[in-house]
């Protein structure tokens, strides 16, 4: 089997392209009528995802509530657009510091990923797809990436590391007593 090498644009060039393309998409009213999530690939092509199932939204809401309660002042956002080496990706939930929030300015998507990015894993997500998103978020500047499994079980990652026992940013994010589930 032969290997494939992907050529990516330099980060600054890809970021500028992503911002232009995202602004184009947001300026088109028809996209606001589409159900589901819109992302782009590194070529600017639109990737449409079906609307999330209620369980997915429930986990997002619980994670948002816990982050809002447990983290220091900052912003907690759902469906957060982030410029990555492979286009604009939307993290299910993020926590962003006040400093990074100020750096966002008037941009329509983050050029540096929020400190914590969370992906709620859907039945259709492959392990490879989730691993790629984790890598893209770290490459874009995330300091931790969390995944939420089908039953609310959380896995925490630091850059280039195996799963962590607990979050370094939010050590109090713990499972409910007598349960494996965090949410």
Residue ranges and their predicted role:
Residues 1-183:
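Gly/Pro/Ser/Thr-rich low-complexity, intrinsically disordered segments predominantly at protein N-termini
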């Amino acid at each position: 089997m032969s290997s494939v090498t992907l050529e990516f644009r330099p980060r600054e060039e890809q970021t500028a392209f992503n911002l232009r393309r995202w602004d184009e998409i947001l300026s088109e009213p028809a996209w606001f009528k589409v159900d589901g999530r819109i992302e782009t690939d590194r070529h600017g092509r639109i990737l449409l995802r079906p609307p999330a199932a209620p369980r997915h939204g429930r986990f997002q809401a619980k994670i948002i509530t816990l982050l809002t309660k447990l983290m220091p002042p900052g912003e907690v956002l759902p469906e957060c657009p982030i410029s990555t080496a492979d286009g604009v990706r939307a993290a299910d939930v993020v926590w962003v510091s006040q400093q990074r929030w100020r750096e966002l300015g008037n941009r329509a998507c983050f050029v540096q990923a929020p400190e914590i990015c969370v992906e709620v894993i859907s039945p259709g997500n492959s392990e490879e797809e989730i691993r790629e998103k984790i890598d893209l978020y770290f490459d874009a500047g995330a300091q931790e990436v969390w995944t939420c499994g089908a039953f609310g079980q959380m896995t925490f990652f630091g850059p280039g590391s195996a799963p962590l026992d607990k979050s370094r940013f939010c050590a109090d994010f713990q499972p409910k007593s007598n349960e494996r589930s965090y949410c």
